[in-house]
Amino acid sequence: MAAAAASAPQQLSDEELFSQLRRYGLSPGPVTESTRPVYLKKLKKLREEEQQQHRSGGRGNKTRNSNNNNTAAATVAAAGPAAAAAAGMGVRPVSGDLSYLRTPGGLCRISASGPESLLGGPGGASAAPAAGSKVLLGFSSDESDVEASPRDQAGGGGRKDRASLQYRGLKAPPAPLAASEVTNSNSAERRKPHSWWGARRPAGPELQTPPGKDGAVEDEEGEGEDGEERDPETEEPLWASRTVNGSRLVPYSCRENYSDSEEEDDDDVASSRQVLKDDSLSRHRPRRTHSKPLPPLTAKSAGGRLETSVQGGGGLAMNDRAAAAGSLDRSRNLEEAAAAEQGGGCDQVDSSPVPRYRVNAKKLTPLLPPPLTDMDSTLDSSTGSLLKTNNHIGGGAFSVDSPRIYSNSLPPSAAVAASSSLRINHANHTGSNHTYLKNTYNKPKLSEPEEELLQQFKREEVSPTGSFSAHYLSMFLLTAACLFFLILGLTYLGMRGTGVSEDGELSIENPFGETFGKIQESEKTLMMNTLYKLHDRLAQLAGDHECGSSSQRTLSVQEAAAYLKDLGPEYEGIFNTSLQWILENGKDVGIRCVGFGPEEELTNITDVQFLQSTRPLMSFWCRFRRAFVTVTHRLLLLCLGVVMVCVVLRYMKYRWTKEEEETRQMYDMVVKIIDVLRSHNEACQENKDLQPYMPIPHVRDSLIQPHDRKKMKKVWDRAVDFLAANESRVRTETRRIGGADFLVWRWIQPSASCDKILVIPSKVWQGQAFHLDRRNSPPNSLTPCLKIRNMFDPVMEIGDQWHLAIQEAILEKCSDNDGIVHIAVDKNSREGCVYVKCLSPEYAGKAFKALHGSWFDGKLVTVKYLRLDRYHHRFPQALTSNTPLKPSNKHMNSMSHLRLRTGLTNSQGSS
């Protein structure tokens, strides 16, 4: 029968296979060539499990602990076949079915105050319909293993909600205790908790079974019979979530809007109906506490509730096959965990301290099929439970493959944060995919954008590091180019000269002309050998000389004859014939005959005194050294030439710049000289006692400081020459002053009308440059003191009382201001600064508006406020100044130009 059942699925069509899986409560994806074998295998397993459950009947469940087969008292024998059928059909047991919580040692004693908490209650009599808890068959990244995820668990359907189970700071649902309350007695002995671990929390509300629900765990027997033969790596899970250390999931209504990708939008309508049903059930799920401590491995703390078992009781075996199927976005899951912690419509998770426990590094064998999805709602679990999760798809029971894990006691504020910082690897087919962060307990919970950014960088860290950056690419290209040119140069240096072929023969096509045509062949061969020997000897000697290892470059005729005689007596007789052929040939054959002088012409062999090679034979390193020296020498010469050109250009540029600067200074000096002469002429008109001319040295000394006179001598001479040649208003005369003759300048006064129209008088206000507003004037007066800039040019001022004209101009401009009590002119200021003190800030503000932005003597006047203490520190005499200052006369000379210009404008407009 089993064989028939095994072969039957192979003959099913795609539609029949889909309907069969739907009949078992599964929701498969599209049937393709890659998914069909997996679906057939799953259907075969479901049928075998169904047959085994029918054979087992009401027998107690068996365990599959490969380490120790000590069997705890079966607590689900009375659960009946309904639960077994529900487990086989993929239906999760109701939260009220708590028969699996009973252990022989009094484990998990349940308060009797809840009449509906046992099987005898109303909830134990009804069976959950199979259609109420479909599971969705999905695939891992390579579609090689099947993952099943309860659709009604997340409330969103598809991968949107399957992905949220693993990283929400929660643990997957627990395995039924009927299947997992078996542990190795030795392991229980080793995992005996410390004395302070046994602290109990007050008992929580008693468990109540919602009406219409019935629990059953009899499917464990069928699994127990064939569990030893099953390969954990090839066993496909039926459920996608499982508790690690007995965590309790937060109600799923908080997660129904979670979306991990945009590929599962078509399942939202179907999954929303599951959400409504699941929400109605989650409202009635009570929480309970154990009255006896469990071993550390089975410690379950819902937000810090410590649940441990006695030493004699079994440990809680945990299965996490497909602990979080399809979880694709870690950061989204952590955001859901944060939402669950805040309790927005969800059960509040207790955050009491989690005790320190230790997990032995022993891998447990697969025990039972995965627990049903709503089982965890009746168990208290710690969101800070930090056991590792085995994410192998066919991994079977919970296994701890890494060395021992320790969990420190967490404060209440860090209990949930610790669980949210747990990282689980999603690689379903790697040898070891357990990740555990060292700073799990101490890492603070980050905000959602920070956590999402952190997870993105985490993904980048595990990505392959074989990317070739642009920096290394540039270095590689540069190195390749350098190597190319280096090899090219070395190849060039290693090449032979063009005069000698590669096999060493002389580069003479026909060494014997018509003159030697009658020579016998044997003599020709002997003569050629003689020339070869001489050529090699002379080339070696010349090469040694060029490389510096020998001081001799040439070989005398006697030495050459002795060398040939040492080689053989036959070469001695042919030596003269060879020399004659070299002289008669007239071509460069690599051997040169030299007489007593280097430029001596040779016509007979008797005149030949020395033999010299024209092609020195040098070693590779000698050639390289000579080439390096030659190239370096030429580069130095080139650089020297470039430097010389740059120096010449720089000097020319410097000369041009200096000439331009001297020309500009000359024109500035001319302007200053003209201003001095004009001002002196105006002063002479007012004061008839003054001479109408000025000595040229006196003008020079008034315009140029003593320390600059030597440097400015050339500029002054050019300015004097320019005035003599180009300025008609200045006349040069010779006058006797103080008994000595001096060259003087006299200003020739133009006509009065032209002066009034064209000539701008000195020390007068010439109008406003811009209007004052909030952008260039503060709305309130800050201090009673002002600092006025650009009122004068100290270089242009002549005499000792010129500062009085500046003070008079300020008082005339502010004639309507009766609050000015002190004016100080800084004669040495290059900015032409004048300081004014008023009686109050209001008077200072009035003066600010009158002076700021005005033209005075061709300069733009600017004003700013100055602190009173700094003003008194600079001018201590102003402390006692309280009398308002007034202009010395009523003519308002500094304002006359404004009246004149206004009058001219009006007259021109009327005409």
From Swiss-Prot:
Membrane topology note: Multi-pass membrane protein
Modified residues (Phosphoserine): 27, 140-141, 144, 185, 187, 259, 261, 280, 352, 402, 777, 911
Acidic residues: bias regions: 217-236, 259-269
Region annotation Interaction with SMAD1, SMAD2, SMAD3 and SMAD5: where it falls in the sequence: 699-911
Feature: compositional bias, Polar residues: 879-896
Function comment: Can function as a specific repressor of TGF-beta, activin, and BMP signaling through its interaction with the R-SMAD proteins. Antagonizes TGF-beta-induced cell proliferation arrest.
Identification of the protein by name: Inner nuclear membrane protein Man1
Disease connection: Buschke-Ollendorff syndrome: A disease characterized by osteopoikilosis and disseminated connective-tissue nevi. Osteopoikilosis is a skeletal dysplasia characterized by a symmetric but unequal distribution of multiple hyperostotic areas in different parts of the skeleton. Elastic-type nevi (juvenile elastoma) and collagen-type nevi (dermatofibrosis lenticularis disseminata) have been described in BOS. Skin or bony lesions can be absent in some family members, whereas other relatives may have both.
Low complexity composition bias: residue spans: 63-89
DNA-binding region(s) from the entry: 707-726
Domain LEM residue range list: 6-50
Alphabetized Gene3D superfamilies for the sequence: 1.10.720.40, 3.30.70.330, MAN1, winged-helix domain (1.10.10.1180)
Molecular-function annotations in GO: DNA binding; U1 snRNP binding
Subunit structure: Interacts with SMAD1, SMAD2, SMAD3 and SMAD5. Binds to both phosphorylated and unphosphorylated R-SMADS.
Tissue-specific expression: Heart, brain, placenta, lung, liver and skeletal muscle.
